[in-house]
Amino acid sequence: MKFSLHDIHQFRNKLLIVLSMLFFLLLFSSCKNNIENSKITSTPTATSLKNSESSTTSRRINVVLATIDLAIGRNRLTFGLVDSDQSPLRVDSVKTDYLFMDASKIEVLVEGEAKYVQWPVSKSGVYVSRVNFDTPGTWMIRVKGIDNDGNNFFAETRFAVKSKSFTPAIDSKVPQSQNKKLSDVEDISEISSSTDPDLKLYELSILDAINNDLPTVVVFATPKFCMTQTCGPQVAIVSKLREKFEGQVNFIHIEIYENINDIDGDIEKAKISPIVMEWGIVSEPFTFIIKRNGLLHSKFEGYTSENELFDAIDRVINFKK
């Protein structure tokens, strides 16, 4: 049986809804299964790792990845931490290291730090880290930190890194999409589910933007139907940045669904936008920053703070990575 790209994307969208629900059930509410609250003197992989901190006693917690589209190259990886009482663990920053688990000799290949970013609509949030993966396959993230009571904690999980991302790769050409503009519709509600849409976000198509010799910010989000309730705030941040970079950067908002006026509270009626499928969007919100030459500068899966986007826009304006 053959499946169209639309069928595949519809299946992926439903899967993401399930994953999103599981993520929030695990991360931000209590669950029936108790997480093991044990004292450990080394990590589960420490017997084969010379750099394990065997002298440090830490309690074991859970780490839940919030990023789906991971591939070789530069990545923005986000995750949540769940304490032994099923509550989210929030500290300013944690230490991270990454191991390639398919290697004959498993060792730490990347070390870094992840900072906590609060979401604007609730007490929820995620840790944000930057990592460059050079090999596809199974990787492990290990997280170490100190809680607000001064106690050490440790978490780890495995995940897959693809050889090619669903969305355009960094430094690759982006699709020259001809998304609907304000001039193409009778009412803004046809192309925006924002309660107070910034009309300037709907003046250009991506093709228009690529051809006008300015960097471009494109945010894919559906404020009215967003699973995480971060799409509205994300579009608002993009609108605010548009005002700060007026005349220097193009800004575009594109909805996830092409029939937002027909959904009427029933998400089963939603039809994925062909532009979303063209870009390989697998979650929302998703923000891209494009160079003047139409190559992708950076991308941000999930909610991204104003400061983080501001810094990225400033870099692309000044021809920096």
Language model: regions and residue ranges:
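C-terminal motif of bacterial Sec signal peptides marking the signal peptidase cleavage site
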Residues: L27-S30
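N-terminal secretory signal peptides that target proteins for export/translocation
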Residues: M1-R12
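Non-catalytic, surface beta->alpha helical segment in thiol-disulfide oxidoreductase systems
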Residues: R292-K321
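Bacterial signal peptide processing site
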Residues: K32-I35
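Thioredoxin-like thiol-disulfide oxidoreductase module
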Residues: I256-E284, I289-N293, D314-R315
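Short active-site neighborhood of thiol/selenol oxidoreductases, capturing the structured segment around
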Residues: I206-M227
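Typically the conserved alpha-helix immediately C-terminal to a functionally engaged Cys/Sec
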Residues: T228-F245
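Contiguous segments within soluble domain cores/interaction surfaces
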Residues: N37-I188
